[in-house]
Amino acid sequence: MKTGPKFKICRRLGDRVFGKCQTTKFTISGTEKKRKTSKHPKGQPSEYGLQLLEKQKAKYTYGTTEKQFRNYVDKVKKVKGSNHSVDLYKELESRADNVVFRMGIASTRSLARQLVSHGHILINGKKTRVPSAKIKIKDVIKIRPESRNKAVFKDLTEKAK
């Protein structure tokens, strides 16, 4: 996953792309930028421009690179007679880092990616360090016993109570 100017990307693509985009600081800075007017206002985006923005939004939201995203799209296109956009989101939602985020173990997708890549998460009893690992429906996801006393997971036990 590429690091870079998160606020600039959030302003361009809209909110809810990164965890930082959901803070009050971002909403305040966004309203200040909207007040400024330009001498040359931007025109209506083309169909291609809208598709590019949607692709970039999905790519940044799920923390994939261009190549990974392209591979997911190619994999989905091979399946005949299905809704490709729904299948693409199913593929992205079944990634290990996204499942850890959806379970509430991590507060953001980037933190979930870090927890998986540092080996704090067990999938079916095996330590997995690949954030893009595909999770199936009956897979068991646990926190590694040696990692349970970390500060990240202490908050989790308080939330669960």
Model regions: which residues?
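Short, well-ordered loop/turn sites that connect or cap secondary structure elements
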Residues: L115-V116, I135
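Ferredoxin-like alpha/beta domains used as RNA- or RNAP-binding modules
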Residues: M1-M103, V130-K161
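Beta-rich strand-turn-strand
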Residues: A106-R109
